[in-house]
Swiss-Prot record:
<keyword id="KW-0732">Signal</keyword>
<feature type="signal peptide">
    <location>
        <begin position="1"/>
        <end position="19"/>
    </location>
</feature>
<feature type="glycosylation site" description="N-linked (GlcNAc...) asparagine">
    <location>
        <position position="116"/>
    </location>
</feature>
<feature type="glycosylation site" description="N-linked (GlcNAc...) asparagine">
    <location>
        <position position="376"/>
    </location>
</feature>
<keyword id="KW-1003">Cell membrane</keyword>
<keyword id="KW-0449">Lipoprotein</keyword>
<feature type="glycosylation site" description="N-linked (GlcNAc...) asparagine">
    <location>
        <position position="284"/>
    </location>
</feature>
<feature type="glycosylation site" description="N-linked (GlcNAc...) asparagine">
    <location>
        <position position="309"/>
    </location>
</feature>
<dbReference type="GO" id="GO:0098552">
    <property type="term" value="C:side of membrane"/>
</dbReference>
<keyword id="KW-0175">Coiled coil</keyword>
<keyword id="KW-0325">Glycoprotein</keyword>
<keyword id="KW-0336">GPI-anchor</keyword>
<comment type="function">
    <text>Predicted GPI-anchored protein which may have a role during host infection.</text>
</comment>
<protein>
    <recommendedName>
        <fullName>Predicted GPI-anchored protein 17</fullName>
    </recommendedName>
</protein>
<feature type="glycosylation site" description="N-linked (GlcNAc...) asparagine">
    <location>
        <position position="62"/>
    </location>
</feature>
<feature type="glycosylation site" description="N-linked (GlcNAc...) asparagine">
    <location>
        <position position="520"/>
    </location>
</feature>
<dbReference type="GO" id="GO:0005886">
    <property type="term" value="C:plasma membrane"/>
</dbReference>
Protein backbone atom coordinates (compact mmCIF):
# COMPACT_ATOMS: atom_id res chain seq x y z
CA UNK A 1 0.00 0.00 0.00
CA UNK A 2 2.79 2.42 0.84
CA UNK A 3 4.79 1.57 -2.26
CA UNK A 4 1.77 2.06 -4.51
CA UNK A 5 1.09 5.47 -3.00
CA UNK A 6 4.67 6.65 -3.55
CA UNK A 7 4.65 5.31 -7.11
CA UNK A 8 1.42 7.11 -7.91
CA UNK A 9 2.79 10.42 -6.60
CA UNK A 10 5.99 10.09 -8.64
CA UNK A 11 4.01 9.27 -11.78
CA UNK A 12 1.73 12.30 -11.32
CA UNK A 13 4.73 14.60 -10.78
CA UNK A 14 6.43 13.32 -13.90
CA UNK A 15 3.30 13.85 -15.95
CA UNK A 16 2.97 17.46 -14.76
CA UNK A 17 6.62 18.23 -15.55
CA UNK A 18 6.35 16.73 -19.01
CA UNK A 19 3.14 18.73 -19.71
CA UNK A 20 4.88 21.98 -18.66
CA UNK A 21 7.72 21.37 -21.08
CA UNK A 22 5.36 20.87 -24.02
CA UNK A 23 3.54 24.26 -23.84
CA UNK A 24 6.45 26.71 -24.26
CA UNK A 25 6.92 29.63 -26.64
CA UNK A 26 9.88 27.88 -28.27
CA UNK A 27 8.21 24.54 -28.73
CA UNK A 28 4.73 25.63 -29.92
CA UNK A 29 4.35 29.34 -31.00
CA UNK A 30 1.28 28.46 -33.07
CA UNK A 31 -0.57 27.34 -29.97
CA UNK A 32 0.23 30.63 -28.25
CA UNK A 33 -0.98 32.62 -31.28
CA UNK A 34 -4.22 30.69 -31.33
CA UNK A 35 -4.63 31.26 -27.62
CA UNK A 36 -4.11 35.02 -28.03
CA UNK A 37 -6.61 35.11 -30.90
CA UNK A 38 -9.13 33.21 -28.85
CA UNK A 39 -8.66 35.64 -25.98
CA UNK A 40 -9.33 38.62 -28.31
CA UNK A 41 -12.52 36.99 -29.54
CA UNK A 42 -13.47 36.27 -25.97
CA UNK A 43 -12.96 39.94 -25.06
CA UNK A 44 -15.07 41.00 -28.06
CA UNK A 45 -17.83 38.62 -27.06
CA UNK A 46 -17.73 39.86 -23.50
CA UNK A 47 -17.85 43.51 -24.65
CA UNK A 48 -20.73 42.75 -27.00
CA UNK A 49 -22.59 40.95 -24.26
CA UNK A 50 -22.05 43.90 -21.94
CA UNK A 51 -23.46 46.36 -24.49
CA UNK A 52 -26.44 44.11 -25.16
CA UNK A 53 -27.11 43.85 -21.45
CA UNK A 54 -26.95 47.63 -20.99
CA UNK A 55 -29.12 48.21 -24.06
CA UNK A 56 -31.68 45.72 -22.87
CA UNK A 57 -31.65 47.31 -19.44
CA UNK A 58 -32.35 50.78 -20.83
CA UNK A 59 -34.97 49.49 -23.26
CA UNK A 60 -36.82 47.77 -20.44
CA UNK A 61 -37.22 51.03 -18.51
CA UNK A 62 -40.50 52.82 -19.15
CA UNK A 63 -39.38 56.43 -19.03
CA UNK A 64 -42.83 57.75 -19.86
CA UNK A 65 -44.45 56.17 -16.83
CA UNK A 66 -41.59 57.33 -14.61
CA UNK A 67 -41.86 60.92 -15.81
CA UNK A 68 -45.64 60.87 -15.52
CA UNK A 69 -45.46 59.57 -11.97
CA UNK A 70 -43.27 62.46 -10.80
CA UNK A 71 -45.20 65.19 -9.01
CA UNK A 72 -43.40 68.20 -10.48
CA UNK A 73 -45.80 70.68 -8.91
CA UNK A 74 -45.10 69.53 -5.38
CA UNK A 75 -41.35 69.46 -6.03
CA UNK A 76 -41.54 72.99 -7.45
CA UNK A 77 -43.42 74.24 -4.40
CA UNK A 78 -40.91 72.66 -2.00
CA UNK A 79 -37.94 74.08 -3.94
CA UNK A 80 -39.42 77.58 -4.08
CA UNK A 81 -40.09 77.56 -0.34
CA UNK A 82 -36.50 76.46 0.25
CA UNK A 83 -35.16 79.38 -1.82
CA UNK A 84 -37.32 82.15 -0.41
CA UNK A 85 -37.12 81.24 3.27
CA UNK A 86 -34.25 82.65 5.34
CA UNK A 87 -33.14 84.64 2.28
CA UNK A 88 -31.51 81.58 0.72
CA UNK A 89 -31.90 83.19 -2.69
CA UNK A 90 -28.61 84.99 -2.06
CA UNK A 91 -26.75 81.73 -2.61
CA UNK A 92 -28.31 81.41 -6.06
CA UNK A 93 -27.40 85.03 -6.82
CA UNK A 94 -23.78 84.39 -5.84
CA UNK A 95 -23.60 81.29 -8.02
CA UNK A 96 -24.95 83.17 -11.03
CA UNK A 97 -22.57 86.08 -10.45
CA UNK A 98 -19.68 83.62 -10.27
CA UNK A 99 -20.73 82.10 -13.61
CA UNK A 100 -20.92 85.59 -15.07
CA UNK A 101 -17.43 86.51 -13.85
CA UNK A 102 -15.87 83.35 -15.29
CA UNK A 103 -17.48 83.73 -18.77
CA UNK A 104 -18.20 80.03 -18.64
CA UNK A 105 -21.71 80.29 -20.11
CA UNK A 106 -20.86 82.39 -23.19
CA UNK A 107 -17.75 80.31 -23.83
CA UNK A 108 -19.84 77.14 -23.79
CA UNK A 109 -22.42 78.71 -26.13
CA UNK A 110 -19.74 79.90 -28.54
CA UNK A 111 -17.98 76.54 -28.53
CA UNK A 112 -21.14 74.49 -29.03
CA UNK A 113 -22.22 76.60 -32.00
CA UNK A 114 -18.80 77.03 -33.63
CA UNK A 115 -17.76 73.37 -33.54
CA UNK A 116 -19.30 71.34 -36.36
CA UNK A 117 -19.82 68.16 -34.35
CA UNK A 118 -21.31 69.86 -31.32
CA UNK A 119 -23.47 72.07 -33.54
CA UNK A 120 -24.92 69.00 -35.24
CA UNK A 121 -25.62 67.42 -31.85
CA UNK A 122 -27.36 70.59 -30.66
CA UNK A 123 -29.44 70.67 -33.84
CA UNK A 124 -30.51 67.06 -33.42
CA UNK A 125 -31.43 67.64 -29.79
CA UNK A 126 -33.51 70.68 -30.72
CA UNK A 127 -35.29 68.77 -33.49
CA UNK A 128 -36.04 65.87 -31.16
CA UNK A 129 -37.28 68.20 -28.42
CA UNK A 130 -39.63 70.24 -30.60
CA UNK A 131 -42.46 67.63 -30.60
CA UNK A 132 -42.34 67.58 -26.81
CA UNK A 133 -43.15 71.28 -26.55
CA UNK A 134 -46.76 70.73 -27.57
CA UNK A 135 -47.27 68.60 -24.45
CA UNK A 136 -46.02 71.36 -22.14
CA UNK A 137 -48.17 74.22 -20.93
CA UNK A 138 -46.09 77.36 -21.65
CA UNK A 139 -48.30 79.68 -19.61
CA UNK A 140 -46.23 79.41 -16.38
CA UNK A 141 -43.06 80.21 -18.34
CA UNK A 142 -44.55 83.34 -19.93
CA UNK A 143 -46.00 84.50 -16.63
CA UNK A 144 -42.66 83.98 -14.89
CA UNK A 145 -40.85 85.93 -17.63
CA UNK A 146 -43.28 88.79 -17.11
CA UNK A 147 -43.20 88.82 -13.32
CA UNK A 148 -39.41 88.55 -13.12
CA UNK A 149 -38.70 91.01 -15.93
CA UNK A 150 -36.13 88.64 -17.41
CA UNK A 151 -37.39 88.93 -21.00
CA UNK A 152 -37.23 92.71 -20.95
CA UNK A 153 -33.83 92.78 -19.24
CA UNK A 154 -32.43 90.44 -21.89
CA UNK A 155 -33.62 92.54 -24.83
CA UNK A 156 -32.82 95.87 -23.18
CA UNK A 157 -29.27 94.84 -22.25
CA UNK A 158 -28.72 93.62 -25.80
CA UNK A 159 -29.82 96.96 -27.26
CA UNK A 160 -27.99 99.07 -24.68
CA UNK A 161 -24.69 97.27 -25.23
CA UNK A 162 -22.50 99.58 -27.35
CA UNK A 163 -21.02 96.64 -29.26
CA UNK A 164 -24.34 95.29 -30.53
CA UNK A 165 -24.70 97.63 -33.51
CA UNK A 166 -21.09 97.13 -34.69
CA UNK A 167 -21.58 93.38 -34.32
CA UNK A 168 -24.74 93.42 -36.46
CA UNK A 169 -23.10 95.67 -39.03
CA UNK A 170 -20.04 93.43 -39.27
CA UNK A 171 -22.25 90.37 -39.78
CA UNK A 172 -24.11 92.13 -42.59
CA UNK A 173 -20.86 93.30 -44.20
CA UNK A 174 -19.44 89.78 -44.11
CA UNK A 175 -22.60 88.41 -45.69
CA UNK A 176 -22.45 91.02 -48.45
CA UNK A 177 -18.77 90.35 -49.08
CA UNK A 178 -19.40 86.63 -49.33
CA UNK A 179 -22.42 87.11 -51.60
CA UNK A 180 -24.47 84.87 -49.37
CA UNK A 181 -27.86 86.34 -50.15
CA UNK A 182 -28.92 83.47 -52.37
CA UNK A 183 -32.03 85.14 -53.73
CA UNK A 184 -31.58 83.35 -57.02
CA UNK A 185 -33.31 80.32 -55.62
CA UNK A 186 -36.28 82.50 -54.83
CA UNK A 187 -36.54 84.74 -57.90
CA UNK A 188 -34.21 83.49 -60.59
CA UNK A 189 -33.98 79.80 -59.83
CA UNK A 190 -35.19 77.14 -62.19
CA UNK A 191 -37.61 74.44 -61.29
CA UNK A 192 -39.06 71.46 -63.06
CA UNK A 193 -42.58 70.22 -62.71
CA UNK A 194 -44.13 67.14 -64.25
CA UNK A 195 -47.85 67.13 -64.75
CA UNK A 196 -49.82 64.07 -65.66
CA UNK A 197 -52.92 64.74 -67.71
CA UNK A 198 -55.96 62.82 -66.61
CA UNK A 199 -58.66 62.17 -69.17
CA UNK A 200 -62.05 63.14 -67.85
CA UNK A 201 -65.40 63.50 -69.51
CA UNK A 202 -66.55 66.96 -70.37
CA UNK A 203 -69.40 68.34 -68.37
CA UNK A 204 -71.40 68.57 -71.56
CA UNK A 205 -71.13 64.83 -72.08
CA UNK A 206 -71.98 63.71 -68.55
CA UNK A 207 -75.19 61.69 -68.56
CA UNK A 208 -77.48 63.27 -65.98
CA UNK A 209 -80.46 61.06 -66.74
CA UNK A 210 -81.42 58.84 -63.83
CA UNK A 211 -83.83 56.12 -64.85
CA UNK A 212 -86.76 55.54 -62.53
CA UNK A 213 -88.90 52.45 -63.01
CA UNK A 214 -92.60 52.96 -62.28
CA UNK A 215 -94.42 49.66 -61.84
CA UNK A 216 -97.94 51.12 -61.68
CA UNK A 217 -98.70 51.19 -65.42
CA UNK A 218 -99.49 48.03 -67.51
CA UNK A 219 -96.00 48.15 -68.92
CA UNK A 220 -92.71 49.14 -67.23
CA UNK A 221 -91.74 52.69 -68.13
CA UNK A 222 -88.28 54.35 -67.74
CA UNK A 223 -88.41 58.11 -67.38
CA UNK A 224 -85.78 60.80 -66.91
CA UNK A 225 -85.54 62.73 -63.66
CA UNK A 226 -85.87 65.90 -65.63
CA UNK A 227 -89.07 64.87 -67.41
CA UNK A 228 -91.09 62.82 -64.91
CA UNK A 229 -94.76 62.53 -65.86
CA UNK A 230 -96.71 63.59 -62.79
CA UNK A 231 -99.55 61.32 -63.87
CA UNK A 232 -97.56 58.44 -62.38
CA UNK A 233 -98.37 59.82 -58.91
CA UNK A 234 -102.08 59.48 -59.66
CA UNK A 235 -101.45 55.93 -60.83
CA UNK A 236 -99.76 55.11 -57.51
CA UNK A 237 -102.69 56.46 -55.48
CA UNK A 238 -105.14 54.59 -57.67
CA UNK A 239 -103.32 51.30 -57.23
CA UNK A 240 -103.29 51.86 -53.47
CA UNK A 241 -107.05 52.25 -53.40
CA UNK A 242 -107.51 49.16 -55.60
CA UNK A 243 -105.35 47.10 -53.24
CA UNK A 244 -107.70 48.01 -50.36
CA UNK A 245 -110.87 46.94 -52.15
CA UNK A 246 -111.99 50.26 -53.63
CA UNK A 247 -112.83 49.60 -57.26
CA UNK A 248 -112.71 53.12 -58.58
CA UNK A 249 -111.82 53.75 -62.17
CA UNK A 250 -108.08 53.89 -62.85
CA UNK A 251 -106.68 57.13 -64.03
CA UNK A 252 -105.27 57.16 -67.54
CA UNK A 253 -101.52 57.44 -68.04
CA UNK A 254 -101.83 60.79 -69.79
CA UNK A 255 -103.66 62.63 -67.02
CA UNK A 256 -102.34 66.09 -66.11
CA UNK A 257 -102.31 66.74 -62.39
CA UNK A 258 -102.10 70.17 -60.80
CA UNK A 259 -101.36 70.45 -57.08
CA UNK A 260 -101.66 73.54 -54.99
CA UNK A 261 -100.76 73.67 -51.30
CA UNK A 262 -101.66 76.55 -49.04
CA UNK A 263 -100.65 76.98 -45.40
CA UNK A 264 -102.74 78.98 -42.97
CA UNK A 265 -101.28 79.87 -39.57
CA UNK A 266 -103.66 80.89 -36.81
CA UNK A 267 -103.62 80.94 -33.02
CA UNK A 268 -105.34 77.58 -32.96
CA UNK A 269 -103.09 75.71 -35.34
CA UNK A 270 -101.98 75.25 -38.91
CA UNK A 271 -104.25 73.88 -41.62
CA UNK A 272 -102.76 72.14 -44.60
CA UNK A 273 -104.97 71.73 -47.64
CA UNK A 274 -104.41 69.96 -50.92
CA UNK A 275 -106.79 71.31 -53.53
CA UNK A 276 -107.55 71.26 -57.22
CA UNK A 277 -106.67 67.76 -58.32
CA UNK A 278 -108.76 67.42 -61.47
CA UNK A 279 -108.56 64.50 -63.89
CA UNK A 280 -110.69 62.60 -66.38
CA UNK A 281 -111.51 60.02 -63.68
CA UNK A 282 -113.58 60.24 -60.49
CA UNK A 283 -110.82 60.91 -57.89
CA UNK A 284 -110.79 64.31 -56.16
CA UNK A 285 -107.92 64.91 -53.69
CA UNK A 286 -109.37 67.45 -51.30
CA UNK A 287 -107.17 66.94 -48.24
CA UNK A 288 -106.58 64.88 -45.15
CA UNK A 289 -109.07 64.75 -42.27
CA UNK A 290 -108.59 63.62 -38.70
CA UNK A 291 -106.83 64.48 -35.41
CA UNK A 292 -103.09 64.96 -35.54
CA UNK A 293 -102.37 61.97 -33.32
CA UNK A 294 -104.89 59.56 -34.94
CA UNK A 295 -103.84 57.45 -37.92
CA UNK A 296 -106.10 57.50 -41.01
CA UNK A 297 -106.92 54.30 -42.92
CA UNK A 298 -105.81 54.29 -46.56
CA UNK A 299 -109.43 53.81 -47.70
CA UNK A 300 -110.32 57.25 -46.31
CA UNK A 301 -107.38 59.00 -47.95
CA UNK A 302 -108.68 62.12 -49.68
CA UNK A 303 -112.33 61.65 -48.77
CA UNK A 304 -112.95 64.65 -46.47
CA UNK A 305 -110.87 67.69 -45.43
CA UNK A 306 -108.48 67.24 -42.51
CA UNK A 307 -107.24 69.83 -40.00
CA UNK A 308 -103.94 69.05 -38.26
CA UNK A 309 -103.87 70.75 -34.85
CA UNK A 310 -100.20 71.38 -34.06
CA UNK A 311 -101.17 73.42 -31.02
CA UNK A 312 -102.46 70.30 -29.31
CA UNK A 313 -99.19 68.54 -30.00
CA UNK A 314 -97.18 71.41 -28.53
CA UNK A 315 -99.38 71.44 -25.42
CA UNK A 316 -98.88 67.72 -24.92
CA UNK A 317 -95.09 67.94 -25.37
CA UNK A 318 -94.94 70.91 -23.00
CA UNK A 319 -96.86 69.02 -20.36
CA UNK A 320 -94.53 66.06 -20.72
CA UNK A 321 -91.46 68.27 -20.31
CA UNK A 322 -92.79 69.93 -17.16
CA UNK A 323 -93.75 66.69 -15.52
CA UNK A 324 -91.56 65.66 -12.60
CA UNK A 325 -90.85 62.01 -12.06
CA UNK A 326 -90.64 60.75 -8.52
CA UNK A 327 -87.86 58.33 -9.33
CA UNK A 328 -85.41 57.35 -6.58
CA UNK A 329 -82.74 56.31 -9.10
CA UNK A 330 -82.91 59.66 -10.87
CA UNK A 331 -82.68 61.50 -7.56
CA UNK A 332 -79.61 59.48 -6.62
CA UNK A 333 -78.02 60.24 -9.99
CA UNK A 334 -78.65 63.96 -9.52
CA UNK A 335 -77.04 63.80 -6.10
CA UNK A 336 -74.00 62.01 -7.51
CA UNK A 337 -73.72 64.61 -10.27
CA UNK A 338 -73.71 67.43 -7.72
CA UNK A 339 -70.98 65.68 -5.75
CA UNK A 340 -68.90 65.22 -8.90
CA UNK A 341 -69.23 68.92 -9.68
CA UNK A 342 -67.94 69.73 -6.22
CA UNK A 343 -65.02 67.33 -6.65
CA UNK A 344 -64.21 68.91 -10.03
CA UNK A 345 -64.09 72.34 -8.43
CA UNK A 346 -61.66 71.08 -5.81
CA UNK A 347 -59.47 69.47 -8.47
CA UNK A 348 -59.42 72.70 -10.49
CA UNK A 349 -58.39 74.65 -7.40
CA UNK A 350 -55.63 72.15 -6.60
CA UNK A 351 -54.42 72.19 -10.20
CA UNK A 352 -54.27 75.97 -10.15
CA UNK A 353 -52.40 75.90 -6.87
CA UNK A 354 -49.89 73.42 -8.28
CA UNK A 355 -49.46 75.50 -11.42
CA UNK A 356 -48.88 78.52 -9.19
CA UNK A 357 -46.06 76.57 -7.53
CA UNK A 358 -44.31 76.20 -10.89
CA UNK A 359 -44.88 79.87 -11.72
CA UNK A 360 -43.48 80.95 -8.35
CA UNK A 361 -40.37 78.79 -8.73
CA UNK A 362 -39.68 80.02 -12.27
CA UNK A 363 -40.26 83.61 -11.20
CA UNK A 364 -37.79 83.23 -8.34
CA UNK A 365 -35.09 81.75 -10.59
CA UNK A 366 -35.65 84.18 -13.47
CA UNK A 367 -35.56 87.15 -11.11
CA UNK A 368 -32.22 85.96 -9.75
CA UNK A 369 -30.85 85.69 -13.29
CA UNK A 370 -32.07 89.21 -14.08
CA UNK A 371 -30.42 90.61 -10.94
CA UNK A 372 -27.07 88.96 -11.60
CA UNK A 373 -24.44 90.05 -14.11
CA UNK A 374 -24.77 86.81 -16.06
CA UNK A 375 -26.82 88.28 -18.92
CA UNK A 376 -24.69 91.38 -19.31
CA UNK A 377 -21.37 89.53 -19.36
CA UNK A 378 -22.74 86.88 -21.71
CA UNK A 379 -23.94 89.49 -24.20
CA UNK A 380 -20.68 91.42 -23.95
CA UNK A 381 -18.66 88.26 -24.59
CA UNK A 382 -20.72 87.08 -27.56
CA UNK A 383 -20.95 90.40 -29.43
CA UNK A 384 -17.18 90.85 -29.17
CA UNK A 385 -16.17 87.26 -29.91
CA UNK A 386 -14.82 86.78 -33.43
CA UNK A 387 -15.53 83.06 -33.38
CA UNK A 388 -19.17 83.63 -32.49
CA UNK A 389 -19.48 86.30 -35.19
CA UNK A 390 -18.09 83.88 -37.78
CA UNK A 391 -20.53 81.22 -36.59
CA UNK A 392 -23.48 83.58 -36.99
CA UNK A 393 -22.32 84.47 -40.50
CA UNK A 394 -21.97 80.80 -41.37
CA UNK A 395 -25.44 79.98 -40.09
CA UNK A 396 -27.00 82.89 -41.98
CA UNK A 397 -25.15 81.84 -45.13
CA UNK A 398 -26.74 78.41 -44.90
CA UNK A 399 -30.16 79.99 -44.46
CA UNK A 400 -29.81 82.36 -47.42
CA UNK A 401 -28.28 79.75 -49.70
CA UNK A 402 -31.36 77.58 -49.17
CA UNK A 403 -33.87 80.38 -48.91
CA UNK A 404 -36.17 78.76 -51.47
CA UNK A 405 -36.55 75.54 -49.53
CA UNK A 406 -36.67 77.50 -46.27
CA UNK A 407 -39.63 79.58 -47.44
CA UNK A 408 -41.29 76.48 -48.85
CA UNK A 409 -40.96 74.76 -45.50
CA UNK A 410 -42.35 77.81 -43.72
CA UNK A 411 -45.34 77.97 -46.05
CA UNK A 412 -45.99 74.24 -45.68
CA UNK A 413 -45.84 74.37 -41.89
CA UNK A 414 -49.04 73.67 -40.02
CA UNK A 415 -49.24 76.91 -38.07
CA UNK A 416 -52.47 75.83 -36.41
CA UNK A 417 -50.36 73.78 -34.00
CA UNK A 418 -48.91 77.05 -32.65
CA UNK A 419 -52.33 78.41 -31.76
CA UNK A 420 -52.15 77.23 -28.11
CA UNK A 421 -48.68 78.76 -27.80
CA UNK A 422 -49.84 82.12 -29.17
CA UNK A 423 -52.92 82.05 -26.95
CA UNK A 424 -50.78 81.38 -23.88
CA UNK A 425 -48.46 84.24 -24.84
CA UNK A 426 -51.32 86.70 -25.24
CA UNK A 427 -53.11 85.58 -22.09
CA UNK A 428 -49.96 85.82 -19.97
CA UNK A 429 -49.66 89.58 -20.47
CA UNK A 430 -45.97 89.33 -21.38
CA UNK A 431 -46.24 91.47 -24.52
CA UNK A 432 -48.15 94.29 -22.85
CA UNK A 433 -45.73 94.32 -19.93
CA UNK A 434 -42.77 94.37 -22.32
CA UNK A 435 -44.16 97.31 -24.30
CA UNK A 436 -45.04 99.21 -21.13
CA UNK A 437 -41.53 98.78 -19.75
CA UNK A 438 -39.97 99.89 -23.04
CA UNK A 439 -42.02 103.10 -23.22
CA UNK A 440 -41.10 103.99 -19.65
CA UNK A 441 -37.37 103.28 -20.05
CA UNK A 442 -35.72 106.62 -20.88
CA UNK A 443 -32.28 105.04 -21.13
CA UNK A 444 -33.48 102.57 -23.76
CA UNK A 445 -35.10 105.32 -25.82
CA UNK A 446 -31.91 107.39 -25.71
CA UNK A 447 -29.79 104.42 -26.81
CA UNK A 448 -32.13 103.63 -29.68
CA UNK A 449 -32.07 107.23 -30.85
CA UNK A 450 -28.28 107.34 -30.70
CA UNK A 451 -27.98 104.08 -32.62
CA UNK A 452 -30.31 105.24 -35.38
CA UNK A 453 -28.65 108.64 -35.72
CA UNK A 454 -25.18 107.09 -35.69
CA UNK A 455 -26.15 104.78 -38.54
CA UNK A 456 -27.89 107.28 -40.83
CA UNK A 457 -25.93 110.43 -39.97
CA UNK A 458 -22.38 109.15 -39.77
CA UNK A 459 -21.22 110.97 -42.89
CA UNK A 460 -23.01 114.18 -41.91
CA UNK A 461 -21.45 114.12 -38.47
CA UNK A 462 -18.02 113.57 -40.01
CA UNK A 463 -18.40 116.60 -42.26
CA UNK A 464 -19.92 118.82 -39.57
CA UNK A 465 -17.07 118.10 -37.17
CA UNK A 466 -14.50 119.26 -39.69
CA UNK A 467 -16.44 122.41 -40.57
CA UNK A 468 -17.23 123.37 -36.97
CA UNK A 469 -13.75 122.89 -35.59
CA UNK A 470 -12.73 126.02 -33.74
CA UNK A 471 -9.88 125.06 -31.47
CA UNK A 472 -8.31 122.19 -33.36
CA UNK A 473 -10.15 119.53 -31.36
CA UNK A 474 -12.83 117.01 -32.23
CA UNK A 475 -15.67 116.75 -29.74
CA UNK A 476 -17.84 113.87 -30.86
CA UNK A 477 -16.22 112.44 -34.00
CA UNK A 478 -14.04 109.38 -33.34
CA UNK A 479 -10.40 110.38 -33.86
CA UNK A 480 -9.67 107.12 -35.67
CA UNK A 481 -12.31 107.91 -38.32
CA UNK A 482 -10.95 111.42 -38.79
CA UNK A 483 -7.37 110.24 -39.14
CA UNK A 484 -8.41 107.49 -41.56
CA UNK A 485 -10.19 110.03 -43.75
CA UNK A 486 -7.34 112.54 -44.00
CA UNK A 487 -4.28 110.31 -43.78
CA UNK A 488 -4.03 109.95 -47.58
CA UNK A 489 -3.91 113.73 -48.02
CA UNK A 490 -1.23 114.50 -45.40
CA UNK A 491 1.88 112.71 -46.56
CA UNK A 492 3.85 115.92 -46.38
CA UNK A 493 3.02 116.59 -42.76
CA UNK A 494 4.78 113.58 -41.33
CA UNK A 495 7.38 112.97 -43.97
CA UNK A 496 7.50 109.25 -43.23
CA UNK A 497 5.76 107.48 -46.13
CA UNK A 498 2.38 109.13 -45.48
CA UNK A 499 1.64 107.55 -42.12
CA UNK A 500 0.83 109.14 -38.80
CA UNK A 501 2.71 106.74 -36.59
CA UNK A 502 5.02 109.37 -35.18
CA UNK A 503 2.76 112.43 -35.44
CA UNK A 504 0.98 113.63 -32.36
CA UNK A 505 -2.77 113.71 -32.94
CA UNK A 506 -3.27 117.16 -31.40
CA UNK A 507 -0.40 118.61 -33.41
CA UNK A 508 -1.80 117.03 -36.54
CA UNK A 509 -5.26 118.54 -36.02
CA UNK A 510 -3.81 121.95 -35.22
CA UNK A 511 -1.65 121.79 -38.33
CA UNK A 512 -4.61 121.00 -40.56
CA UNK A 513 -6.69 123.76 -38.95
CA UNK A 514 -3.91 126.33 -39.36
CA UNK A 515 -3.40 125.28 -42.98
CA UNK A 516 -7.09 125.77 -43.71
CA UNK A 517 -7.26 129.21 -42.06
CA UNK A 518 -4.08 130.69 -43.53
CA UNK A 519 -4.16 129.36 -47.05
CA UNK A 520 -7.93 129.58 -47.61
CA UNK A 521 -7.30 127.67 -50.81
CA UNK A 522 -9.65 125.19 -52.41
CA UNK A 523 -6.94 122.58 -52.70
CA UNK A 524 -6.40 122.11 -48.97
CA UNK A 525 -6.65 118.68 -47.43
CA UNK A 526 -9.74 119.51 -45.42
CA UNK A 527 -11.63 120.93 -48.39
CA UNK A 528 -10.63 117.90 -50.41
CA UNK A 529 -12.08 115.70 -47.72
CA UNK A 530 -15.24 117.77 -47.60
CA UNK A 531 -15.70 117.53 -51.35
CA UNK A 532 -15.16 113.78 -51.21
CA UNK A 533 -17.77 113.40 -48.47
CA UNK A 534 -20.28 115.92 -49.83
CA UNK A 535 -23.70 114.68 -50.83
CA UNK A 536 -25.13 111.27 -50.18
CA UNK A 537 -22.91 108.24 -50.47
CA UNK A 538 -24.57 105.14 -51.92
CA UNK A 539 -21.61 102.82 -51.80
CA UNK A 540 -21.31 99.47 -50.06
CA UNK A 541 -21.12 101.23 -46.71
CA UNK A 542 -24.56 102.73 -47.22
CA UNK A 543 -26.16 99.40 -47.99
CA UNK A 544 -24.38 97.75 -45.09
CA UNK A 545 -25.75 100.35 -42.70
CA UNK A 546 -29.26 99.81 -44.06
CA UNK A 547 -28.98 96.06 -43.49
CA UNK A 548 -27.51 96.74 -40.06
CA UNK A 549 -30.61 98.73 -39.12
CA UNK A 550 -32.88 95.91 -40.22
CA UNK A 551 -30.75 93.43 -38.32
CA UNK A 552 -30.94 95.61 -35.21
CA UNK A 553 -34.71 95.76 -35.37
CA UNK A 554 -34.84 92.00 -35.92
CA UNK A 555 -32.75 91.42 -32.81
CA UNK A 556 -35.01 93.81 -30.89
CA UNK A 557 -38.04 91.77 -31.86
Amino acid sequence: MKFSTVFTAIFALGTAVSAQQVVTPASDPLALELSQRNLDKLYELQERDLFSIVEGLFSSINYTSILDSIDYESIAGWTNNLLVENNNIEYLDNILNFLGDTDLVPFAVSYLLSNNETRNIVGEVVIEALPLIKDIDPTPIFVALKNSGLAYVLVADLIKNPNTVPFVKQVVVDLLDEGSFGLGDLFGGSSEATTTAVAIDSLATINTNIDLTVAAAPTTKAQSIGSIDTASLAVLFSEARTANGNGATKVANTVAVTAQVTAQVTNVGTTAKATKAVATGEINYSGITGPAYESLPPTQFGSVPTSINYSALSQISGALRKREYNDAVEAALRDIQKREEGIDDVEIALRKMKRDNIEDLLTTIFASVARSNLLNTTIQYLVTDQRFESTVVELLQGVFENIGSTLTGILDTDWSALQPLVSSLLNSGLLTDFISRAFNDDELKAVLWNDITSIFKRDMAFRDEIVKRSNGTITSLPVSDFITGVATETSALDGADGTLSSLDVTAFINTVSHSFITSNASSSAVITIQSDNAGSSYGPGFYSTIFAVFGLFAMMI
